[in-house]
Amino acid sequence: MSGSTGERSFADIITSIRYWVIHSITIPSLFIAGWLFVSTGLAYDVFGSPRPNEYFTESRQGIPLITGRFDPLEQLDEFSRSF
C-alpha cells in the first residue's frame, strides 16, 4: 500500500454532517433553478430554439424540407424568408 495523500476517504465525506448540510441545500436549489429556467421559457431564448407554438406559423404549415439537389440555397432562402 502506498503512502497517504492526506485526503479524506469517500466514506468519511458522505457520512459527515457537513456534507449533508451543504448538499441538502445545493441539490434542491439546482433542481429548482433548472425547473425555473425551462418553465419560464428562458431556455428557449438563451439557446434560440423555437417555442412549441412557433414551429408552424399560419403562413408556413409544411415541413421545411430541402428536396432539390442542385438548388438547395434557393430553397434555404425561401424558408428563411418565411420566418
Curated annotation (Swiss-Prot):
<dbReference type="GO" id="GO:0009055">
    <property type="term" value="F:electron transfer activity"/>
</dbReference>
<keyword id="KW-0813">Transport</keyword>
<keyword id="KW-0793">Thylakoid</keyword>
<comment type="function">
    <text>This b-type cytochrome is tightly associated with the reaction center of photosystem II (PSII), and is essential for PSII function. PSII is a light-driven water:plastoquinone oxidoreductase that uses light energy to abstract electrons from H(2)O, generating O(2) and a proton gradient subsequently used for ATP formation. It consists of a core antenna complex that captures photons, and an electron transfer chain that converts photonic excitation into a charge separation.</text>
</comment>
<protein>
    <recommendedName>
        <fullName>Cytochrome b559 subunit alpha</fullName>
    </recommendedName>
</protein>
<dbReference type="InterPro" id="IPR006217">
    <property type="entry name" value="PSII_cyt_b559_asu"/>
</dbReference>
<dbReference type="Pfam" id="PF00284">
    <property type="entry name" value="Cytochrom_B559a"/>
</dbReference>
<keyword id="KW-0604">Photosystem II</keyword>
<dbReference type="InterPro" id="IPR037025">
    <property type="entry name" value="PSII_cyt_b559_asu_sf"/>
</dbReference>
<comment type="similarity">
    <text>Belongs to the PsbE/PsbF family.</text>
</comment>
<keyword id="KW-0479">Metal-binding</keyword>
<keyword id="KW-0934">Plastid</keyword>
<keyword id="KW-0349">Heme</keyword>
<keyword id="KW-0408">Iron</keyword>
<dbReference type="GO" id="GO:0009539">
    <property type="term" value="C:photosystem II reaction center"/>
</dbReference>
<keyword id="KW-0249">Electron transport</keyword>
<dbReference type="GO" id="GO:0005506">
    <property type="term" value="F:iron ion binding"/>
</dbReference>
<dbReference type="InterPro" id="IPR006216">
    <property type="entry name" value="PSII_cyt_b559_CS"/>
</dbReference>
<dbReference type="GO" id="GO:0009767">
    <property type="term" value="P:photosynthetic electron transport chain"/>
</dbReference>
<keyword id="KW-0602">Photosynthesis</keyword>
<dbReference type="InterPro" id="IPR013081">
    <property type="entry name" value="PSII_cyt_b559_N"/>
</dbReference>
<feature type="binding site" description="axial binding residue">
    <location>
        <position position="23"/>
    </location>
    <ligand>
        <name>heme</name>
    </ligand>
</feature>
<dbReference type="GO" id="GO:0020037">
    <property type="term" value="F:heme binding"/>
</dbReference>
<keyword id="KW-0812">Transmembrane</keyword>
<dbReference type="GO" id="GO:0009535">
    <property type="term" value="C:chloroplast thylakoid membrane"/>
</dbReference>
<keyword id="KW-1133">Transmembrane helix</keyword>
<dbReference type="Pfam" id="PF00283">
    <property type="entry name" value="Cytochrom_B559"/>
</dbReference>
<keyword id="KW-0472">Membrane</keyword>
<dbReference type="InterPro" id="IPR013082">
    <property type="entry name" value="PSII_cytb559_asu_lum"/>
</dbReference>
<keyword id="KW-0150">Chloroplast</keyword>
<comment type="subunit">
    <text>Heterodimer of an alpha subunit and a beta subunit. PSII is composed of 1 copy each of membrane proteins PsbA, PsbB, PsbC, PsbD, PsbE, PsbF, PsbH, PsbI, PsbJ, PsbK, PsbL, PsbM, PsbT, PsbX, PsbY, PsbZ, Psb30/Ycf12, at least 3 peripheral proteins of the oxygen-evolving complex and a large number of cofactors. It forms dimeric complexes.</text>
</comment>
<feature type="transmembrane region" description="Helical">
    <location>
        <begin position="21"/>
        <end position="35"/>
    </location>
</feature>
